Amino acid sequence: MKRTFQPSVLKRKRVHGFRARMATKNGRQVLARRRAKGRKRLSA
């Protein structure tokens, strides 16, 4: 069985990156929650 995690920086950024989060209303809510919680890293 192949491993499910096949890393790709490009896919990671496109799906979970800061600009991807900012692009949608819900994504901005994610960032707001993470800021409120005090996360050191907001996004990938």
Curated annotation (Swiss-Prot):
Does the keyword field hold Cell inner membrane?
A: no
Q: Name one GO biological process term.
A: translation
Which one of the record's GO molecular function terms can you name? structural constituent of ribosome
Record Pfam families: Ribosomal_L34
Record keyword Lyase present: no
Instruction: Spell out the family assignment given in the record's similarity comment.
Output: Belongs to the bacterial ribosomal protein bL34 family.
Q: What is this protein called?
A: Large ribosomal subunit protein bL34
Q: What is the lineage of its organism?
A: Bacteria, Pseudomonadati, Pseudomonadota, Gammaproteobacteria, Oceanospirillales
